[in-house]
Amino acid sequence: MQTMTIPDVGQAAPDFRLRGADGTFYTLSEYLGDQNVLLVFYPLAFSPVCTHQLPELQAMLPRFEAADTVVFGVSVDSHWSNAAFARSIGVRFPLLSDWKREASAAYGVLIPDKGYSGRASFLVDKQGRILWREISENTGSIEEIPSLEAALAALAKA
């Protein structure tokens, strides 16, 4: 998928500062000590698989919230595109714009020759360590959507 290093379970999660669809900037560090963070990298807004994936995550949102976890979708799309995308598919959790590709690179999921990230999920605990991760090798396959049930199981064990 990439030539960058993907942070492993147990390692510190890279911080980020990304603009949400509402124009607000979000950082990982502002949640440390308070909430777990689930980062769901998706290739592109309005693409067929992403349009299927994110509503599934929206349906699971109450379970993540009950586990004291904030959820963010992350793509290289502009925050305006993410706002329109969120409205069109009924997603209420923040979709963050990685316009400069810095977060995608830091998490090792940027596909340089395509200019967007692969499909990947990282669960970061309250101490800022990666508790669980799943990387999809095929960004265009619905079967390769990361198993978020596994993320919930990792939270239950933590």
Q: Where are the predicted features?
A:
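Chalcogenol-based redox active-site neighborhoods
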Residues: M1-A158
